[in-house]
């Protein structure tokens, strides 16, 4: 938009001959506004290009991290729901701990109880714990978490006399403590479960070859140095001794 000013005239010529000349003064705001708009458009375009490049370059990395996070989440969930892995992880961090794997062969070794193995599979002992005569020896007086699991697979065929007899024989698993101060064995924990149960249970299922059942024991006890812990289990011929199915352990708190 232009502005106009009046040019000076000769006063001696009189008002009749007075001439007025209008001179247009160009405004400086017009071209500055156009330059600002152009710079703004250029900046927006540049920002759009940068955003587009960042999205496509970062997308594969985001997908990779997302996949890794999902895999780790599934792995953590599996470990949390598996008592064997959870107890193994906790006990391995304790200063004094022992974790044993169970084995049974009626033709070899102990015939009337589970044979506990150290240094086999995930089994270990540290902090003074010892395995003596198939018993765990407590190294120091204090609080300890004692645990054990026994897994069974029992044939429950009604047409089999031996299988029918198992209907009447429950599964049992017990942890006993021997202390010199008491001079005798004392039961710390025990559990009894029906061998053949056609109704749904949390710790039993069938695969067509037999019923699987698990007995788990675990609690905190005040134990003395030199105390000995052992297990007692029936129906040993039905015991499942694959790695992680039958175990026995203690760790200090």
Curated annotation (Swiss-Prot):
The chain crosses the membrane at residues 35-57. It is found in: Membrane. Gene3D superfamilies: 2.60.120.40. Residues 1-34 are cytoplasmic. The keyword Transmembrane helix applies. Keywords: Cytokine, Disulfide bond, Membrane, Signal-anchor, Transmembrane, Transmembrane helix. It is a single-pass type II membrane protein. Residues 58-253 are extracellular. It comes from the Eukaryota. SUPFAM superfamilies: TNF-like (SSF49842). Residues 96-253 form the THD domain. GO terms for biological process: immune response. The keyword Aminoacyl-tRNA synthetase does not apply. GO terms for cellular component: extracellular space; membrane. Belongs to the tumor necrosis factor family. Cytokine that binds to TNFRSF1A/TNFR1 and TNFRSF1B/TNFBR. This is Tumor necrosis factor. It comes from Sparus aurata.
